[in-house]
């Protein structure tokens, strides 16, 4: 893997193409399973697929950054099922479709660390200490990285799965706790030195920091032509 490692800043820059006007424009990346008006919306060179477009239907031709829903794969999925939610792993085929898109078009998939989707789809869990390792499917690479290094107020340990792209050296290992800057109603929680994630809303927890988003887009823009995409 050493031959494909690059500095993170170089990876974030990605590849560009020349537009008709002679100006460089970023290579188009399809952002799958993203929020309307969220981090990937209205960006040059990004084709966002929100819930209304149904990213399971994506048929190319661009490399992808995929954020498939994680609720049915997280540690609390069983508890949620006991209270009426769908069964663990029953995500309507979203993860499987995202995995297929990354394998066919190249790119990177993001999920919370310890996601049960890895085992369910035959992928090897990456070491929490960081570093890219083979995913065990003869196709992709996987790693663990904390988004706290990239501006998320929580640590937010994350697993990535990448195919056909350059693999940048990321900020490996534990990230420092970030101070929580919520309203005064949370002052007693700050005084008690509680983790930010414990007082964050769901929307705050799942947001992708701009620096991490740009890193993923930069990786996808290095995607090489995939044999199955012909």
Question: What is the meaning of each model-derived region?
Answer:
Residues 15-230:
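Class I S-adenosyl-L-methionine
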Residues 1-16:
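Compositionally biased, low-complexity flexible segments
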